[in-house]
Structures are given as structure tokens and as C-alpha cells.
Amino acid sequence: MVVNFKIFKKASPNNMVTLYMNRREFVDSVTQVEPVDGIVVLDDEYIRQNRKIFVQLICNFRYGREDDEMIGLRFQKELILVSQPVYPEQKIDIQLTKMQERLLKKLGSNAYPFILEMPPSSPASVVLQQKANDSTQPCGVQYFVKVFAGENDCDRSHRRSTVNLGIRKVQYAPTKTGIQPCTVVRKDFLLSPGELELEVTLDRQLYYHGEKISINICVRNNSNKVVKKIKAMVQQGIDVVLFQNGQFRNTIAFAESSEGCPLNPGSSLQKIMYLVPNLAANCDRAGIAVEGDVKHKNTSLASTTLIASQEARDAFGIIVSYAVKVKLFLGALGGELCAELPFILMHPKPSLKAQPEAETEEA
């Protein structure tokens, strides 16, 4: 049986250092993260010169616009999560993956493996979408595997002998789903003997990207007010942990309905509204959280960020959440009544299938 696979390849500008990786997405299961593994191939000249080669896992966190930077002030942090020498070889035992074993046989004696352990508390790959004509670096969290030649791992790397390959830290939907989301809110009014009650229920807690969200709405009007209109929204919550006031929300899908309205005192109404949150409807809006961009990779809305606890939040990260919000409009003097239900929006875990044919992609 022949197993086919895809390999990502990127060489330094001087072609002396080449990086091979069989994947660019590494799964975070909350308690642990898949190790980052690959192969570095060196030119014969670097071997003869006994040049020192290092590999690093870099987390790049940009928290401000590049256009707003001034001399001596940068809104960017580059964090070295892991640093490891590749050549000369160190006397350490590495548990090679099957893919690394195959690549070592194919690439020859100038190939050297590495495995980098990503900290479980490191933030997920998330960037904030920019305007279409904005060519600056986006705000958010991005990861890179960096291979360079230098005297030590703190040495300033030269561009001609450096390889940077973007990767992503991703989370997939859990296998166990939570309880069905449901909430009931009530509002009483001055000089009104009764209450206005709004009950909102979702058909489930977990949704995959592109799926339709079914919102069951039940209104019981025991007050003397009149419900004029109903509006349902899907909101994306973004929490930039570094800032105390770094929380904001974006409405990424909404629908309004006047069917069954006006809802007079003593009446009730039950209806279902459907919403589909997707990036296609928000592709021109700045500030929407999307999955960290990787070359040749179609992106989507950022998935819900799963963390073990609030204390485990990384200071250089962005926490993404989603909620359905239903609002009843009661007119100019009556005000509004709102109900909110959080839910999880993620990708399903892909099945492990072989690629249709073997290929090496230039990154």
C-alpha cells in the first residue's frame, strides 16, 4: 500500500538552508498541543564551514496599527517560545515521527530533524481583518517556524540565510456537546400590572462554520406595552487580553421581523428565526476576527477560543466568543427587552485521509 502525502518546502534566499514540514496546522486540545516537527536540509558548503544552525518557534503578537508606529515605539511583540540547535547535532534523543523517518531517508545525510513543544497556554492563531486596500501587517497572533544561521540562538539573523514559515495553532470542536442553551428574561414597567417575558432557545450549543443557527423565540406579553418588532443577531466577542478595556463586539449576522407584530397586551407569539454567520457577508469589514492567515489557505471566521480556565489566558492573546442576541422593540417610550445566549462556533476535526497524490508545495 502506497501512502501519499503533501510536504511544505521553503528555502532561504541564498538556498543554503531549506525547511521541510508535512503540515502547517497544529491542534490544541486545551490541555496539550501537538508538537511542531520538521526537517532542515543544509547545503554542503554550510556543512564544511561547520555553521551553527538554530530553529525557533516564534509567536508574533501585533496589538496596534503599523501606520501609528513612531520612532522607538512599536505595537508588536515577537516572542521566542522555543529555541533549539539543529546543527551541529546535539546528543539528545528525539522521538521521530514516521513522516520524519521517511523524509530523512529521502533527503540524505544533510537532513536534520527537529521537534518543538508548543506551550499549551500559548494563544490561538487569530488576526483582525483589515480593509481591502490595507497592505500593513494585521493585528493579532501569528506563528512562525524560523531557521537561521548564527553564532548562538540570540544572534541577529541575516535575511539571506533565514527561513520563516508561517504555521497555525488551531482548535477543533469537542466531541462532547453541552446542554441545549435556553434563557428567559422578564421586564416589568412602571404603572403596568404585568410583565413582558422573552424566552430564547437554540437547537444545540455547538455549531460548525457555515451551519444554520435555529433561534426559537417565544414572547408572552402580560404587560400593557406593544411589541413593534423583533431583531435577532449573531455577535462575535473579541477580548484583547493585554488591554483592560480591550473587549468589543461585532454583529456578523442579523435578521429583523415584524411578522406577528404589533404584539398587543395579553397576546403571545412563538416563531423561529434562522441566521448563518460567515465571513463572506463580512469580507469588507475591518475588525472582524478571522483565523490566522497562512499562505495558500482559505480563511474563515475565527473559531471560539477554548481555554482551561480564566487564569490560563495568555496576556499576548485574543479570546474569541460568540452569542445570539434577541431584541424586542417596544417603541420610543417603551424601550427594549434583550436576551442573550452564548454558543460555540468551530470547525469539526478533519478525518485522517491520505492525499490523492504526493506533492511538495513551495511555501
UniProtKB/Swiss-Prot annotation:
UniProt record similarity statement = Belongs to the arrestin family.
Q: Which UniProt keywords apply?
A: Sensory transduction, Vision
Q: List the disulfide bonds.
A: none
Q: Which molecular function GO terms apply here?
A: G protein-coupled receptor binding
Show the SMART domains listed in the entry.
Arrestin_C
- Which Gene Ontology BP terms does the record give? G protein-coupled receptor internalization; signal transduction; visual perception
Q: What InterPro entries does the record point to? A: Arrestin, Arrestin-like_C, Arrestin-like_N, Arrestin_C-like, Arrestin_CS, Arrestin_N, Ig_E-set
Do you know which PANTHER family this protein is assigned to?
ARRESTIN (PTHR11792), PHOSRESTIN-2 (PTHR11792:SF16)
Among PROSITE patterns, the record links this protein to: ARRESTINS
Taxonomic classification: Eukaryota, Metazoa, Ecdysozoa, Arthropoda, Hexapoda
Q: Which domain of life is it from?
A: Eukaryota
Task: Specify the protein name.
Answer: Phosrestin-2
- Quick one: a GO cellular component term? cytoplasm
